[in-house]
């Protein structure tokens, strides 16, 4: 909600929904949450020809729960997810996937169009440095300032040298 305030989009707070508080217990039972319920309902207003694009980061519990609530939405959505590792990677020990393995199995196995942004082996190569944050973000708008200051603070906290760069995922 803070990001919506920074974007001066208070109007979107009414259509911003809380997600799940737990992970899936199995591959058959959804975790009910306002976010999953809204996604299941909202996706029904779209068609295979004009699908709803769903962008997700972190654990994929909400999307998997929506698919369990209304399996027919698989033909009405295109899921873009930052999670899992690249197919050539030797393992799939990745934070977002590990949080909810059952949800990962659902989204990969349901037949929905999926654009995976693999963490290790792909997104791990997307990095940005402090000078880049300062040059490209600071002074553009309140949201850019917030994100740049936050990322610079985090980068400095974890940096092992004066000069650093960090991966730009969630």
Name each region found by the language model.
Residues 1-170:
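N-terminal acidic, glycine/proline-rich low-complexity segments
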């Amino acid at each position: 909600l803070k990001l919506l305030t920074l974007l001066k989009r208070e109007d979107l707070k009414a259509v911003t929904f809380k997600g799940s508080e737990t992970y899936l217990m199995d591959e058959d039972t959804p975790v009910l949450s306002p976010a999953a319920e809204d996604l299941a309902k909202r996706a029904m207003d779209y068609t295979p020809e004009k699908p709803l694009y769903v962008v997700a980061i972190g654990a994929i519990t909400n999307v998997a729960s929506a698919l369990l609530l209304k399996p027919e939405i698989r033909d009405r959505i295109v899921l873009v997810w930052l999670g899992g590792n690249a197919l050539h990677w030797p393992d799939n020990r990745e934070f977002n996937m590990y949080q909810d393995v059952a949800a990962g199995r659902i989204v990969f196995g349901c037949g929905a169009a999926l654009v995976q942004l693999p963490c290790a082996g792909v997104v791990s190569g997307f990095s940005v440095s402090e000078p880049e944050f300062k040059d490209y973000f600071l002074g553009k708008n309140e949201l850019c300032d917030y994100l740049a200051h936050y990322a610079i603070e985090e980068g400095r906290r974890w940096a092992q040298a004066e000069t650093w760069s960090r991966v730009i995922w969630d």
